[in-house]
């Protein structure tokens, strides 16, 4: 549905916002693009509907070469791409009905067709009873629902969400995400969602990529990335070790024989550790554990300290891997993290 190849963006002042971006979003995907402020996320999503122009690269949406379109053709194609923003962008002098109708007026819909379409959209987002309300009379969540209805007005195939929940409280965020998920399923939309909130990715997305310093540093299914984040930025964003685990590990004098065991999908609820203990006659201390509920399933984490010979431990770990479980040696991982931090300190001093 959406395909970007070798996309670069350099501004006239020389600032490089995007570096060789390759990204593909399939029909029906909810792709979460996450990163810290200034990473290039918003530039990337604005290139998809050409609110920003790339310096180089190719961009296709629904098989159409977006960069080869003239202005009138671009306007027609943009009707297939809905977009919602952090700050709603509603017209204060228009009521809810007229804010949604505005998108249809711009697209030159027949006047007789506008009312039934707006009524349909307001029912979809749960605002039928507030059609005559003005933006000043709405809560933040209600304003975003109006913005969603407006973005869907022209039957788009793609929905772009630029920090759509970052101005909302936690409860309202959950309701908006539930609405977006329901709409995506009903309409079969492809959704690209920009956020710095990992909870948003966990709640709604099936795919994700991590952007840092203008480049995609990690990508994959949400379950894969949450289970085994590889890049240091990803680990920071998803809190690779929850606070309780980090606290426990920081107080361990010796990380030898300490492993993180990651269970995904159906494995999250199987008694594999107890089976392993019986099968291989090993003693194990469970230092911490948790289960993350994702939009596509669950990911469970246990931090285990083995009290066993190296041979028994290795056989037990091999058996766990054969059951579909991922294993991470925290001793080795902490050593690698220390090396990265040391390199960063050396580089910063050199600068």
Swiss-Prot record:
Tell me which SUPFAM superfamilies the record gives: ACT-like (SSF55021), P-loop containing nucleoside triphosphate hydrolases (SSF52540)
Q: Which InterPro entries match?
A: AAA+_ATPase (IPR003593), ABC_transporter-like_ATP-bd (IPR003439), ABC_transporter-like_CS (IPR017871), ACT-like_dom_sf (IPR045865), MetN_ABC (IPR041701), MetN_ABC_transporter-like (IPR050086), NIL_domain (IPR018449), P-loop_NTPase (IPR027417)
Gene Ontology molecular function: ABC-type D-methionine transporter activity; ATP binding; ATP hydrolysis activity
Subcellular location(s) per record:
Cell inner membrane
Q: Which PROSITE patterns match?
A: ABC_TRANSPORTER_1, ABC_TRANSPORTER_2, METN
Entry keywords, A to Z: Amino-acid transport, ATP-binding, Cell inner membrane, Cell membrane, Membrane, Nucleotide-binding, Translocase, Transport
Q: What EC designation does it have?
A: 7.4.2.11
Please tell me one Gene Ontology term that the record gives under cellular component.
plasma membrane
Instruction: Report which reactions are catalysed by this protein.
Output: L-methionine(out) + ATP + H2O = L-methionine(in) + ADP + phosphate + H(+); D-methionine(out) + ATP + H2O = D-methionine(in) + ADP + phosphate + H(+)
Q: Where mainly located? A: membrane
The ABC transporter domain sits at: 2-238
Q: Which residues bind ATP?
A: 35-42
Q: Topology in the membrane? A: Peripheral membrane protein
Q: Which domain of life is it from?
A: Bacteria
Query: Could you say which protein family the record assigns here?
Result: Belongs to the ABC transporter superfamily. Methionine importer (TC 3.A.1.24) family.
Cite the record's note on assembly.
The complex is composed of two ATP-binding proteins (MetN), two transmembrane proteins (MetI) and a solute-binding protein (MetQ).
Explain the purpose of this protein. Answer: Part of the ABC transporter complex MetNIQ involved in methionine import. Responsible for energy coupling to the transport system.
Name of protein: Methionine import ATP-binding protein MetN
């Amino acid at each position: 549905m959406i395909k970007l190849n070798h996309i670069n963006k350099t501004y006239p002042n020389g600032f490089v916002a995007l570096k060789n971006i390759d990204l593909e979003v399939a029909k029906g995907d909810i792709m979460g693009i996450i990163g810290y402020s200034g990473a290039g996320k918003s530039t990337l999503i604005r290139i998809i509907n050409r609110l920003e122009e790339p310096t180089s690269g190719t961009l296709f949406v629904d098989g159409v070469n977006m960069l080869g379109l003239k202005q009138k053709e671009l306007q027609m194609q943009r009707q297939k791409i809905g977009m919602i923003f952090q700050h709603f962008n509603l017209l204060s002098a228009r009521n809810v009905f007229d804010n949604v109708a505005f998108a249809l007026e711009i697209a030159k819909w027949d006047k007789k067709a506008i009312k039934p379409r707006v009524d349909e959209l307001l029912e979809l987002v749960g605002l039928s009873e507030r059609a005559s309300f003005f933006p000043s009379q709405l809560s933040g969540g209600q304003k975003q629902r109006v913005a969603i209805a407006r973005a869907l007005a022209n039957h788009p195939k793609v929905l772009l969400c630029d920090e759509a929940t970052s101005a909302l409280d936690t409860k309202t965020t959950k309701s908006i995400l539930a609405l977006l998920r329901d709409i995506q399923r009903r309409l079969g939309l492809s959704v690209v969602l920009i956020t710095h909130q990992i909870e948003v990715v966990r709640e709604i997305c099936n795919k994700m990529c991590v952007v840092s310093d203008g480049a995609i540093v990690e990508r994959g299914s949400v379950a894969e990335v949450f289970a085994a984040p590889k890049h240091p930025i990803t680990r920071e964003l998803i809190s690779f070790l929850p606070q309780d685990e980090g606290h426990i590990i920081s107080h361990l004098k010796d990380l030898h024989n300490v492993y993180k065991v990651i269970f995904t999908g159906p494995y999250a609820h199987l008694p594999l550790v107890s089976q392993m203990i019986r099968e291989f006659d090993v003693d194990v201390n469970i230092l911490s554990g948790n289960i993350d509920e994702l939009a596509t399933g669950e990911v469970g984490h246990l931090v285990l300290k083995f009290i066993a010979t190296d041979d028994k431990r290795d056989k037990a770990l091999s058996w766990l891997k054969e059951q579909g479980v991922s294993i991470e040696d925290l001793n080795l991982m902490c050593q690698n993290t220390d090396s990265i931090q040391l390199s960063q300190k050396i580089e910063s001093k050199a600068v």
